[in-house]
Amino acid sequence: NLYQFKNMIKCTVPSRSWLDFANYGCYCGRGGSGTPVDDLDRCCQIHDNCYNEAGKISGCWPYFKTYSYECSQGTLTCKGDNNSCAASVCDCDRLAAICFAGAPYNNDNYNINLKARCQ
């Protein structure tokens, strides 16, 4: 769920507030359209698509689904006791948090004009 995703981001990118990722580019945060502005925004586009796929599992609501995971020294592990929905959502969040850690953060792409740049 989004609370756990926030904590995963804190695990892999401890130097930044998770809020820095909540309104970034065309895909980080609510919605998503157009061409991603950079690699970090592409991480969010992939995460959005991953949630859409997880949502196809019967009764699976990715934004609200809790799962079991652990963070150890910046390494995320989804636990084996997750059901198929929880395992899918956990993996979406884990992969996105890892992607965030490897992508440069461009302050110019925070809080951009979505109508102008995300067609």
From Swiss-Prot:
UniProt remark on cofactor binding: Binds 1 Ca(2+) ion.
Keyword field: Calcium, Disulfide bond, Hydrolase, Lipid degradation, Lipid metabolism, Metal-binding, Secreted
Main location: secreted
Reaction equation(s) it catalyzes: a 1,2-diacyl-sn-glycero-3-phosphocholine + H2O = a 1-acyl-sn-glycero-3-phosphocholine + a fatty acid + H(+)
Family annotation (SMART domains): PA2c
Compartments, as annotated in UniProt: Secreted
Entry keyword annotation includes Transmembrane: no
Keyword Hydrolase carried by entry: yes
Disulfides per UniProt: C11-C71, C26-C118, C28-C44, C43-C99, C50-C92, C60-C85, C78-C90
Domain of life: Eukaryota
A single MF term (Gene Ontology): calcium ion binding
Coiled coil region boundaries: none
One family name in Pfam for this protein: Phospholip_A2_1
Protein residues bound to Ca(2+): Y27, G29, G31, D48
Cofactor: Ca(2+)
BP-aspect Gene Ontology terms: arachidonate secretion; lipid catabolic process; phospholipid metabolic process
A GO term from the CC aspect: extracellular region
Assigned protein family: Belongs to the phospholipase A2 family. Group I subfamily. D49 sub-subfamily.
Function description: PLA2 catalyzes the calcium-dependent hydrolysis of the 2-acyl groups in 3-sn-phosphoglycerides.
Name of the protein described by the UniProt record: Acidic phospholipase A2 E
